[in-house]
């Protein structure tokens, strides 16, 4: 796994984990702001890493373990904050529960949690998700424009999405969707000594209902935060300055 680091001269470490369907460089708009005060660590999740096109996505569990092991090996067994969005939020959830490393703060932004459903049904849902993204790989740039809100996303944003989709193979598509919705968690989940926030956009409230309920159950002290006017995975992409301000305020809270 490729790990990208910025602001290494800073004492406090912030780990950023990206959503499904994008690459590590999706954080390019917030890195220049945050690296002034924080050591930024961004894992390029296998299957979505342009520098390692031969690597496939494995599982939320394995990726969480590899990230934790890398942090430990590099003297970062305690970090300031873990931030993960969507798929990245699933990885953060698993890292927190396993407790190989410790974090002072964590933000699970629209994070995906394991289905609490009959097992055969989870396979059917996985097949549906796989088909949708596999078909998306073959959609034209013109057709893709109709999917994105032109008032929110630029032509460069749409070309970026098309480039990422074109680079995904079938194995990564299946594994990433299925694992994000069905990853395992320790039983029982240990007490986590970390300030955890679950963020979601007001426009995705219905879609995140089960995730919020699950996170509230496993992390009873979680702070649930609704970001007004936002949809899934929009905050840091469309409003980088406001996102960084809110994240820094969260990391500045005292016990």
State each model region's role.
Residues 41-81:
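Active-site loop/oxyanion-hole signature of alpha/beta-hydrolase fold enzymes
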Residues 5-53:
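Conserved HGGG/HGGXW glycine-rich cap/lid loop of the alpha/beta-hydrolase fold
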Residues 192, 198-200:
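Short beta-strand/loop motif that positions the catalytic acidic residue
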Residues 202-207, 233:
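Acidic catalytic loop of the alpha/beta-hydrolase fold
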Residues 230-241:
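Catalytic histidine-centered segment of alpha/beta-hydrolase-like enzymes
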Residues 117-118, 137-190:
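Conserved alpha/beta-hydrolase catalytic His-Asp/Glu region
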